[in-house]
Amino acid sequence: MQQQPTHFFEGKTLKEVLDHVTHSLGEEAVIWESGESEGNVWVTAISGQEDSSQPHIPLPSPEELLEEAGFSPEILTNFCSFASSRRKKSADSRARLIAFFKKILAQRPSSFDFDAALAQEAPTSFFLVGATGQGKTVTTAKFAVSLIQQGILPIVASLDVIKSGGLFQLEALLQTLDLPVQTLQTQKDIRSLLAKTPSHAFVLIDTPGLNLFDAADRRRIQEWRAEAQGTPFGLLRAGGDLRETEEIIDFFREADITRVGVTHCDATQRLGTVLSAIFSSPMTLEFLCDSPFISQTPQTAFADKIVDMLLSSVKSSRKRAA
């Protein structure tokens, strides 16, 4: 018989964590490991019942996990320095990784305050920029779904009317929500849309694919920002080459874009390259997209979410290798 896989639980108090264990795994659950991290209590547990349907996959060490996920030597060195400074070196891999990413994220600029943006008296506009194939159109639709789930009906517009493919795709994605897509062909159209948009509205603007090595396209971003008076988000595709990703981030920086999101996290086992490039820059990682379906809305880039994705991707690659 194979041992049950371990499950991780974390909370403010031991009682809270044990309640989660009992609720999830039942009264026969067995505590495997326990400890404290960043003021929280954590435990790993197994269900206590044998299950031969799933092989036990041991949790890799944090160093192994970061290396397998493609993180740069700089990040590996930083982690080793961080880990050696911790008193409890035998802590669970997941807990140590979460603490490490919390430390990294705390060193980044503050995340965008969406609630404050919604409270503004003027319309709030957001637009996604990036090269062709980065997921701008699908992510725009995902944000529309996310806002609707919060009880906010967004206004969705598209500047991608020359190639028309992006516009048709966005219209098809939002048709099920009975949400129309405004077409914008010029900067004047952006001004007109915002002029007739009520205060407290949320405007999402899809943009055409850019040549990220063309100064003219950097100017286009500045023009969009000036007219939309909004916040641009750069999109990075997970799994790309580290050097190329760093060059794209340089393009964003030169275009005064400081907030980025990562897409296609579900399609790669190499999250380390894009995350290394972001964490080595002044960029703020705002969200992660781990599903091609618009119903699966963007995930806020919390430390535990990043670690869950890393664990999932490495375990998947090991299963295929076996």
Describe each region flagged by the PLM.
Residues 136:
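Conserved lysine of the Walker
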